[in-house]
Regions:
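Non-catalytic, mostly N-terminal accessory regions of nucleic-acid modification and defense proteins
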Residues: 2-233, 237-238, 242, 300-312, ...
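A conserved structural/catalytic subdomain of Rossmann-like adenosyl-cofactor enzymes
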Residues: 3, 11, 22-24, 28, ...
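Generic recognition of cysteine residues
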Residues: 6-7, 71, 118, 253, ...
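Conserved, well-folded catalytic cores of nucleic-acid-processing
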Residues: 43, 185, 189, 208, ...
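A structure-centric signal for secondary-structure junctions around beta-strands
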Residues: 57, 202, 245, 272, ...
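Conserved S-adenosyl-L-methionine
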Residues: 220-326, 331-333, 337-342, 347-352, ...
């Protein structure tokens, strides 16, 4: 009876009010989680540089996640089958071995109960060989995927987690002491239960830590992580009018956060056939694969490769892609015309010229265009110089404009990225445009200053995306240029060529100014007359 009375007395909220409360609760949880996590991570590193220590914190988080993920998956199945109170973590290893083959097929990996995070952590303080234990556990996890479809997703995943590094301590005992603190620190992070948390705790915490490490690392951080606000803008530009995407691709995927943004914007099952990316740096490549797992992307739903995208692209069999988003490295060197094979490469050949050896930016543009689906959109962050420089880059721009591939160019504010204050821009490309015009958007003032960087607010992003979708003239903000206008400007794609900046100088009223000057001159004359009178009186007295 009591529960019924409670139900009658309950005040029901509207959907909007309830959603608002849930969103506020999520934000509060997220903020609390972030503060606690950074405090733990910062305390754990001690005297070790945060940038060097990131692989240990992030790797330990991953170890905890896959342990809990596997445990909950098995426990849920057993409990649903009527085996109440079952706990895989307490199962003898020899009994668990019987389930290895089936679990590898379903989950892509297997961990023995004794090697689960919770059990290794429980024994860590008393394990004089903890470094060897962890090394063995990580090796076993990687080996468990061998021969399965998930092999490439797990191979070398823990390579950057060096348990014998002097960064952890000068002796085995000191290193193990640090490893115990690592396990306990990550174990104490309030990441909730994998099967029951109100925010995407593991993935959210991982991305927060990467943001903090990237911002503290400056230039090095910018090479592997695109700020969340820029990722949001790129992905929204690429998904205007769409509720689902076939495949998403990033040719310079870094830690993978930009790739994952499409799922956050469109929804969990909106990326039908998965996430594809390539990254040249092996440490960052490992961070990206871990990021996929922590966001609960199945091993059969992502394909991340570690190679030079321009010289050795790994996804020929997977292209074309409906959505391509990327923040490739700015103006790096590449082989260019030193490699005679590249001019005949189907990705670069159509332009008839290669990007300069000292500036590979246009090579990434051509690569992305080549692998773009006919119904797709590519949104690429670009160094501003490629929009106006002459030579080979101008010829490539001519090819892009003549063939009506450039849909929009957006000038971004300066100082949005970690480690560089450059005001970058975005080039949006499509293969089946509805018109032969190019939209130019000047978003240089669409930001707010946060500590040392500028940031795009949700309102800033909305305004840019809205202008992009409407393709209308907006004074001092957006201009829709036809082909003749662009070609007449020698294929210059700089936004400042097409969008006149607003004159923010104070307008001067000449009539009013002249009147003020006349008044000042008259007043000056009165003062002079008074001074002359005083001097004359002094002279008379003498």
């Amino acid at each position: 009876m009591t529960s019924l009375k409670c139900c009658k007395a309950k005040t029901y909220l509207t959907d909007t009010e309830e959603t608002g409360m849930i969103d506020t609760k999520k934000e509060q949880e997220r903020d609390e989680l972030h503060r606690a996590i950074w405090a733990i991570a910062d305390e754990l590193r001690g005297a070790v540089d945060g940038w060097d220590f990131k692989n240990y914190v992030l790797g330990t988080m991953f170890y905890r996640y896959i342990s809990e993920n596997l445990c909950n998956y098995i426990n849920r199945g057993e409990i649903e089958a009527g085996n109440a109170g079952f706990d895989f973590a307490k199962m003898p290893d020899e009994d668990a071995e019987e389930a290895r083959e089936g679990l590898v097929e379903e989950k892509g990996f297997f961990i023995l109960p004794s090697e689960l995070f919770c059990n290794v952590r429980a024994n860590a303080a008393n394990d004089e060989n903890l470094n060897e234990t962890l090394e063995r556990v990580f090796r076993h996890i990687e080996e468990s995927a061998k021969g399965s479809e998930a092999e490439s997703d797990f191979a070398g995943l823990f390579d950057d987690y060096d348990v014998n590094s002097n960064k952890l301590g000068s002796t085995v005992a000191k290193r193990n002491e640090k490893l115990v603190k690592l396990l306990n620190g990550v174990g104490e992070m309030n990441l909730g239960d994998v099967k029951d948390h109100s925010i995407d705790a593991f993935g959210d915490a991982y991305e927060y830590l990467m943001t903090m490490y990237a911002s503290n690392a400056g230039k090095s951080g910018g090479e592997f992580f695109t700020p969340a606000d820029v990722s949001e803008l790129l992905t929204r530009l690429g998904t205007v009018g769409k509720t689902e995407i076939n495949k998403v691709y990033d040719p310079a995927c870094g830690s993978g956060s930009l790739l994952l943004k499409a799922e956050k914007i469109l929804g969990k099952d909106a990326i039908r056939n998965g996430f594809y990316g390539q990254e040249i740096n092996i440490t960052t490549y490992n961070l990206c694969r871990i990021n996929m797992f922590l966001h609960d992307v199945g091993f059969d739903k992502f394909d991340i490769a570690c190679e030079d995208t321009l010289l050795s692209p790994q996804h020929w069999d997977d292209e074309p892609f409906e959505l391509i988003v990327s923040n490739p490295p700015y103006s790096i060197k590449w082989a260019g015309d030193e490699n005679p094979l590249l001019i005949n490469d189907p990705r670069f050949a159509p332009a008839g010229v290669l990007a300069p050896k000292s500036k590979a930016d246009m090579a990434f543009i051509m690569h992305s265009l080549s692998w773009l689906a006919s119904n797709g959109t590519a949104a690429i962050v670009c160094f501003p110089g490629i929009m106006y420089r002459g030579g080979a880059e101008q010829k490539i721009r001519k090819y892009l404009v003549d063939n009506n591939y450039v849909d929009c160019v957006i000038q971004l504010p300066s100082n949005l990225f970690f480690g560089t204050s450059i005001a970058t821009c975005i080039m949006v490309m499509k293969k089946n445009k509805a018109d032969n015009k190019t939209l130019f958007i000047d978003a240089t003032s669409e930001c707010v200053k946060v500590t040392n960087n500028n940031k795009l607010t949700p309102e800033n992003i909305d305004r840019i995306v809205d202008a992009f979708a409407k393709r209308e003239e907006v004074e001092h903000f957006a201009h829709l240029a036809n082909y003749e206008e662009v070609s007449g400007n020698d294929y210059n794609l700089s936004v400042s060529t097409y969008v006149e900046a607003e004159d923010t100088r104070e307008k001067i009223d000449i009539v009013k100014l002249n009147a003020e000057i006349k008044e000042i001159v008259a007043r000056e004359q009165v003062l002079r007359d008074e001074i002359d009178k005083i001097i004359a009186e002094i002279e008379v007295d003498e």
